[in-house]
């Protein structure tokens, strides 16, 4: 069945703005097999995931999620370009990239999550600017499901303050930070 309070399936977006507040579903907003461009996504007080995107190829100008009890943003099986993300008070991962996804992003700001950015299961996350704080783990790349390999994270300009562990990755995965080499 559908997991989103607001689910978009087999659609092409062109400049849409989407807002969700105080959702009570597994995903506040869920995209499945969606393409095109979304101008703005704003989620406040999500019961579980803020934004869940599967099997899609989408460009999103701005995503702002504040207070999601699980992941703020979770993407899988797709190609994604996000221009700006602001993710605050995420119960688990602020940004989770999984299952053979490629995600490119210009700027991400994260404050308060278990894991800042997680790339897993043959996924690649490429970021220009990442400013993170108040995390248990800033960056994590790993293999979770046996049918996939590890995850990759590459960031050009990275800053993480107030954390327990800066990076965590397994033998199948890589994390590369240009301003720290």
Region roles according to the model:
Residues 1-181:
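Extracellular beta-rich repeat passengers
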């Amino acid at each position: 069945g559908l997991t989103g309070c607001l689910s978009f399936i087999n659609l092409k977006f062109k400049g849409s703005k989407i807002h969700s507040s105080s959702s009570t579903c597994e995903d506040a907003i869920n995209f499945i097999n969606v393409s095109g461009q979304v101008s703005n996504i704003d989620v406040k007080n999500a019961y579980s995931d803020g934004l869940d995107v599967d099997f899609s190829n989408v460009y999103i100008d701005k995503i702002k999620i504040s207070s999601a009890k699980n992941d703020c943003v979770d993407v899988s099986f797709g190609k994604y370009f996000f221009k700006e993300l602001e993710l605050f008070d995420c119960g688990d991962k602020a940004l989770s990239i999984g299952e053979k996804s490629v995600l490119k992003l210009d700027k991400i700001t994260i404050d308060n999550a278990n894991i800042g950015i997680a790339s897993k299961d043959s996924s690649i996350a490429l970021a220009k600017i990442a400013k993170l704080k108040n995390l248990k783990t800033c960056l994590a790349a790993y293999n979770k499901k046996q049918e996939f390999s590890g995850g990759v994270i590459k960031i050009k300009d990275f800053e993480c303050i107030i954390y327990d562990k800066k990076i965590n990755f397994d033998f199948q995965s890589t994390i590369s930070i240009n301003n720290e080499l």
